A protein has these predicted regions:
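Nuclease catalytic cores that cleave nucleic-acid phosphodiester bonds
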Residues: 2-179
Length: 179
């Protein structure tokens, strides 16, 4: 089974994850989505209850609900810690949080940013170093501002990256139903 973890509090592509996951589940890929946040986040009711009423006959949504909400404590990094503790090879993590991405990549998970950028074992070290440098420069007042605004192109890149990750993991044998 493929497990997708969404670092959901500020994630702009939650709806895209639901659509892609539902499409792959209807094709027989065994997967589960965990929407992890510090406060309750709305998710499509039909995906939480075990599948939409118009789902193809025989679609099991991995034996139950396709999407599960997880509300963690309000403390700093609670959602990150919950995800990092569970992420492993065969899982996909959706996050823009570079330290969380680093922890999940080290655990063997596929990690994708909402703009479609893949974090890999080869790239995460430099990405983390750049993030830490920029954080230091911002703290010193040398740099103001933040990342570029989220654009439609970012959404398209994310959709392609997520679809590719699910296909790659399915081909590696992770998308098969267990039991």
């Amino acid at each position: 089974m493929i497990t997708l973890y969404i670092d959901a509090d500020a994630c702009p592509v939650k709806q895209e994850v639901y659509r892609v996951a539902e499409r792959h589940a209807e094709k027989g890929t065994a997967l589960k989505v965990f929407v992890v946040s510090n406060s309750p986040i709305a998710v499509p009711r039909d995906l939480v209850s075990g599948g939409p009423p118009d789902a193809k006959p025989g679609t099991t949504f991995a034996g139950g609900p396709l999407v599960e909400r997880v509300v963690v404590g309000a403390g700093m990094d609670e959602a990150d810690n919950w995800i990092a503790k569970r992420a492993r090879a065969g899982d996909i993590v959706v996050t823009a949080d570079v330290p969380l991405a680093s922890r999940c990549v080290k655990a063997g998970a596929e990690v994708i940013a909402p703009n479609g950028k893949r974090f890999t074992a080869d790239s995460i070290g430099m990405t983390l170093a750049t993030r830490n440098l920029m954080d230091s420069l911002r703290s010193a007042g040398a740099i103001t501002g933040g990342p570029k605004p989220f654009a439609p192109r970012d959404r398209s890149s994310f959709l392609a990256a997520l679809d590719q990750a699910i296909v790659r993991l399915t081909r590696a044998g992770f998308g098969k139903a267990t039991g």
